[in-house]
Regions:
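Walker A (P-loop) phosphate-binding loop of P-loop NTPases
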Residues: 11
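Conserved lysine of the Walker
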Residues: 14
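Conserved substrate/cofactor phosphate-moiety recognition/catalytic segment
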Residues: 18-61
Length: 166
């Protein structure tokens, strides 16, 4: 099974890009890692992140058993390298074919996208500052793609290359 991982700061466009890829490729499941640790109030600590990784891998394992599912797109903010490593190790154990990409954009683009996404409960000024502060860390990742001047479909094409199923 093919698994596409989209990492990056909040507001960069992981969800919209992941959903676009899933919709354009029949037999693709979409997983938002946030669903896998949706505890109220939100707690992002070692224990809840480990639980989320376990939930993600369990879901992917189940999709792998389904003859209708050919690919999974996972979107999740993984700023802790050990979390990403745990996901990648788990996918290796599942013998998945993995492409991991970190989406980034410049500061002005992130602010614009943030302000245009009013439907998300996380789009507060406090979280925007946290997201902006994380840009340099994500930009330093070797798999980073700068989406500042790219549309969603251009970003998806860059991620998928010749792997698109449609």
């Amino acid at each position: 099974m093919r698994v596409i991982i989209l990492n990056g700061p909040m507001g960069v466009g992981k969800t919209v890009t992941g959903k676009f890829i899933a919709e354009k490729n029949p037999g693709t499941a979409f997983i938002d890692g946030d669903w896998c640790m949706d505890i109220h109030p939100f707690v992002g600590n070692r224990e809840t992140k480990a639980m989320a990784v376990d939930n993600i891998l369990h879901m992917i394992g189940n999709y792998q058993k389904c003859s209708e599912c050919k690919m999974v797109v996972l979107v999740w903010l993984m700023d802790d390298p050990s979390v990403l490593r745990s996901v990648l190790d788990g996918l290796a154990a599942l013998r998945a074919e993995v492409k991991s990409v970190t989406l980034i954009c410049d500061r002005d683009t992130l602010i614009r996208r943030w302000k245009n996404d009013r439907g998300c409960e996380w789009r507060t000024d406090q979280w925007l500052e946290i997201s902006l502060a994380s840009l340099p860390r994500f930009a330093s990742m070797k798999d980073a793609i700068d989406t500042s001047v790219l549309s969603v479909d251009q970003t998806a094409d860059m991620i998928m290359g010749d792997q698109s199923q449609s």
